[in-house]
Amino acid sequence: MRQTLCDGYLVIFALAQAVILLMLTPLFTGISRQIRARMHSRRGPGIWQDYRDIHKLFKRQEVAPTSSGLMFRLMPWVLISSMLVLAMALPLFITVSPFAGGGDLITLIYLLALFRFFFALSGLDTGSPFAGVGASRELTLGILVEPMLILSLLVLALIAGSTHIEMISNTLAMGWNSPLTTVLALLACGFACFIEMGKIPFDVAEAEQELQEGPLTEYSGAGLALAKWGLGLKQVVMASLFVALFLPFGRAQELSLACLLTSLVVTLLKVLLIFVLASIAENTLARGRFLLIHHVTWLGFSLAALAWVFWLTGL
């Protein structure tokens, strides 16, 4: 399909894909909140509540700590922009990556690391002890989850013979030549995506059930709205990454209106399914102690390491 698309069309597809995911983020997070409320036997807020919250926060006054600096003010914008670049790079609605420059696995890992780095650094920049604890937890969680995600994606790259998401997705769409290896990589990557989505028991940095929300403690107004929007967008992007890699069916094979609309509906339903499953899994688990999180993450890394061993042995 790439040969039939000029650069102008790819730019349009990239921007449209990013805007669609950005605008639907409050809906997906609202559905997640509704599922949590129903499983807790509560009525809960409506699925449109997150749109109202963001709109309300944008109208509120923005107050910053006197000790905060540039990092504190940049963080919400970095969260949004880094995830938008990832959203543009995923081969989600069509079989090619609309923004090929951001579709390499190395770029993906660096963008996720950039997201985490600024999120943690903004907490340290405030001088708040609560934000500092949340920042240290975020960095520790990154140390635990990034090797798992990197190794599982590396196994997929070895199977596809390329580190580009487009090639990996299209290779897996044609069939799993190494089924055992792919299944183990799927489990490890799915586990890593679940952790990156910040679901319970891995929401140790945001800690939204606690009195103080970690690095977001000192944010207000438009900054808080952008930060929450960016965190929600990260959840949608991680779910979309899993869909693009392991559920690549239903994408548009040609540039007709019917194919594009069908691809849009099917893909969004797949992302919604991942969100619903993650929300159900989240609400069946209790919040874990932060000091014991590494006992759980080792399981995912073991699956990724086992997938690599299986690839070496040709399984």
UniProtKB/Swiss-Prot annotation:
Q: Provide Periplasmic-side residue ranges.
A: 1-10, 95-98, 162-181, 250-256, 311-315
Annotated PROSITE patterns: COMPLEX1_ND1_2 (PS00668)
Top enzyme class, one word, equals: oxidoreductase
Q: Where are the transmembrane segments?
A: 11-31, 74-94, 99-119, 141-161, 182-202, 229-249, 257-277, 290-310
Q: What is its EC number?
A: 1.-.-.-
What is a single molecular function from GO for this protein?
oxidoreductase activity
InterPro entries annotated for this entry? Answer: ComplexI_Subunit1, NADH_UbQ_OxRdtase_su1/FPO, NADH_UbQ_OxRdtase_su1_CS
Q: Which GO terms describe its biological process?
A: anaerobic electron transport chain; anaerobic respiration; DNA damage response; formate oxidation; glucose catabolic process
Keyword annotations for this protein? Answer: Cell inner membrane, Cell membrane, Membrane, NAD, Oxidoreductase, Transmembrane, Transmembrane helix
Cytoplasmic-side positions: 32-73, 120-140, 203-228, 278-289
Q: What does this protein do?
A: Possible component of hydrogenase 4.
- Protein name according to UniProt: Hydrogenase-4 component C
